[in-house]
Amino acid sequence: EVIGNTLQITLPPSQVLALRHGPQTWGDRVVVDLAQPATVSLQEQPGSFTVTLDGSAAPSVLSSFAAQPGVLLDQLHATSNGQQTVIRGQIARSARVRLSTLPNPNRIVIDIRADALVPRDILWAPGVRWRQQYVAVGGNPFPVYSVEADLRQPNLSLRSIWTEPSTISGITPLITLANQWQAAIAINGGFFNRNNRHPLGAIRHDNQWISGPILGRGAIAWNDAGDLYFGRLALQQSLTTSNGQQFPINAVNSGYVQAGIGLYTPTWGATYTPILDNETVVVVANDQVVKHQAGGTAGHLAITIPQDGYLLATRAYSTAVNALPPGTQIERTTATVPDAFEAYPEIMGGGPLLVANRTIVLSAQTEQFSQAFATQSAPRSAVGKTADGQLMIVTVHHRPGGSGPSLHQLADIMVQLGCTDALNLDGGSSSSLYFAGTLLNRDPQTAARVNNGLGLFLAP
């Protein structure tokens, strides 16, 4: 029966005939014997699971079932309320549950294993292929979830997404972010400051800098024709006063702060609150200095950003403050480095750059990432380009019984997937791949909130 957008299937209630548990070389197996087919559902959380089936179990069946701790199974308990039977288990946090059914006789099989990923290769929509598989690096198999998309297809488009259209500051779960922007598929994007929730890297949309690049880090750029470009990106910006004095701008709409000038436009939000103590904020409207505002203690004073202008947050830079009295006319200049990025209206920053022209070029130090970041093993997100120019978005999770990949292992995986160019995105607890309403690579309860992402959109 179809109810709204839901297909509702109703079966006659079944009966549980027996419950069996047996340790295996790869983990644990629980088998439920049924009198006839039954609908069943699985809910997973880190370290536990719940299987609910439409069918009763007699007290004698439940009392005779005494599951002992197994390889990955710590506890197992079954209850029945006369209409449904519920099986709850406590398992190793590294384990996952794979649910399957068998006929003749009717059975439900619950496998608890570290390598529970079911390989898939599905053409999900014209120009969109979903894969999940194990990819081995140095003998270690990593679970890899990927979506390959041909952006040259007229029904597909890619764009940056962030927490709210009215501000670039803030964090939210990727599922919420994707639903808010109505993206069919999404992956978490660039880095951000988890304390103040400000972006730390490039986001450009429709030729407008939502947030500027920092530290010469890697980025992906694209256009409406589906062309993709990867490289390390810097932004050279300066302002020139009416009397010829010139000052560099460090960053645009960014949580990355240092001595000098930070530029904040209306894209940042309605107001700017100083990030550091004792900033002097220069208010500019119609390319003319309107006033100076003392920022005071960081995080306290909200300063309005003119809709026809911007703010210059000066930090330990009295020379610039003195050269910008009210009434001063200002001209701004902007150029990307390399200039190849200039041709692309859409950009998302991340880093480090992993692969360029089929060669692993990973250099965390070049992009000013810490040594600890460069060597740690963690879940990862990445974006790449295949030899035939298709976009590939990828997440890689913990290997069975172990940790996630290092950056070097991630670069190797991207090459094995066929990428000629690839970029690391924010990872760890941020690493999330949203696909048609759910996360492919992890339980949503384990996914951290993020500042931004990449959304793939399908035209109706």
PLM region spans:
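Gly/Ser/Thr/Pro-rich low-complexity, intrinsically disordered segments
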Residues: 3-56, 62-460
